[in-house]
A protein has these predicted regions:
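Bacterial N-terminal signal peptides that target proteins for export
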Residues: 2-13
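Secondary-structure end/capping motifs
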Residues: 246-328
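Short, glycine-/small- and polar/acidic-enriched structural segments
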Residues: 29-173, 179-182, 198-204, 221, ...
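Pocket-lining segment of extracytoplasmic ligand-binding domains
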Residues: 187-280
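Short, solvent-exposed loop/beta-turn-alpha elements that line the ligand-binding surface or hinge
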Residues: 61, 128-133, 225-231, 299-312
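Sec/Tat signal peptide C-region and signal peptidase I cleavage site
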Residues: 22-28
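Conserved C-terminal helix/tail region of periplasmic/extracytoplasmic solute-binding proteins
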Residues: 316-351
Length: 351
């Protein structure tokens, strides 16, 4: 064997020995990391930044091991945090406002979105009848909502109901004339495709599934930021007990930064973020067909902020929406939108 070959082979052997020697050390370091539990309200793509952070192991890179579960709704997600069975809840900001009104101890430390991510979908034949597309003037699309029959929603008072009332009011319509059918989230796509309801609004991919099937048409993808009152708006947020984050500042910072880094990737390297999201268990090819994933990604991407910090202006919009939705019934209980009560940037920091 030539000397050069021997040197090359020796280098390979040395590299392998080093790798094997370091493997137990890496495992030990991971074992020493604090473990945190994060519950999400649901498993849709409004939480795309969190899924990418999980897929690319950003939590481990920030120094924590994250166990992520789906709670099956915003209320059980928040209750799990309040009851200390999980450390963090990823859910909607208007839900945190409701928690405040009810006296539950929660604070937002990071924002996954900068706009509501709901997609308002109507039956395709109605979109054709009204001669509407996503390029039609927004006001024309809003006015069509007043002409609908039964509208599907997850439950009474949920954001999937309140968004229709808000948008109809915005266009000058009478929200009291809207008729809602409460079916739960998983049943809504099939209900529209079988003509049980004329419309519904959920975050991707629920509405996009109906469009890919040729039965529905998304006339208002709110994630694109067409409605000013619902843009620059912290929608899905990371919340925790105030006492927990104060007692575990490094952990809170690690989790908030991991999700924010994943969100930043959608802007700095969108194809890398897209590939990671496509590989995740909730949105891989076995779960979502290509057309549904592409529609969903295009809707969600613009709603993901460059970083997860929040502002008082954004929280004013959340509080205004919550007030209009009837979440805040007593004017004396309207919370401040300033940092320190409902939210804080002290953990998420800056890029």
């Amino acid at each position: 064997m030539k000397k050069g070959h021997k040197t090359h082979l020796g280098a390979i052997i040395l590299a392998l020995l080093t790798l094997f020697a370091l493997a137990p050390q890496v495992k030990a370091q991971q074992k020493d990391m604090p473990e945190v539990t994060i519950a999400t309200a649901v498993s849709n793509l409004a939480f795309a930044a969190l899924w990418v952070a999980e897929q690319l192991k950003y939590f481990e890179q920030e120094g924590v091991r994250a166990k992520i579960t789906v709670a099956g709704g915003g209320s059980p997600c928040q209750s799990a945090v309040v009851g200390r069975s999980v450390n963090f809840c990823a859910s909607s900001s208007e839900g945190l406002v409701l928690a405040y009104v009810e006296g539950a101890p929660l604070v937002a430390i990071q924002s996954h979105n900068r706009a509501l991510t709901l997609s308002v979908v109507i039956r395709k034949e109605l979109a054709d009848k009204f001669k509407l597309t996503r390029k039609s003037p927004l006001n024309a699309r809003l006015k069509a909502l007043s002409q609908l029959g039964p509208i599907g929603a997850t439950s009474p008072g949920a954001v999937s109901e309140q968004i229709f009332k808000f948008l109809v009011t915005k266009s000058g319509g009478d929200p009291s004339k809207l008729k809602f059918v409460y079916l739960g989230g998983p049943q809504l796509p099939a209900s529209l495709m079988n003509n049980v309801v004329d419309a519904f609004a959920l975050s991707p991919p629920s509405a996009e599934i109906t469009e890919a099937a040729g039965k529905g048409y998304v006339i208002i993808p709110l994630g694109l930021g067409e409605v000013p009152e619902l843009t620059d708006y912290p929608y899905e947020i990371l919340m925790a007990r105030p006492d927990y984050v104060e007692d575990n500042r490094k952990v809170a910072t690690a989790v908030a930064r991991a999700i924010s880094r994943a969100g930043a990737l959608f802007h700095s390297k969108p194809e890398a973020a897209k590939a990671a999201l496509r590989a995740h268990r909730f949105s891989n090819p076995k779960t979502l067909e290509d057309k549904v994933f592409e529609l969903s990604f295009d809707t969600v991407k613009p709603a993901i902020p460059r970083w997860g910090n929040m502002s008082s202006e954004g929280w004013k919009k959340v509080i205004n929406f919550a007030g209009g939705a009837g979440i805040i019934k007593d004017p004396a209980k309207v919370p401040s939108a300033e940092e320190g009560l409902l939210w804080t940037n002290k953990f998420v920091g800056k890029p």
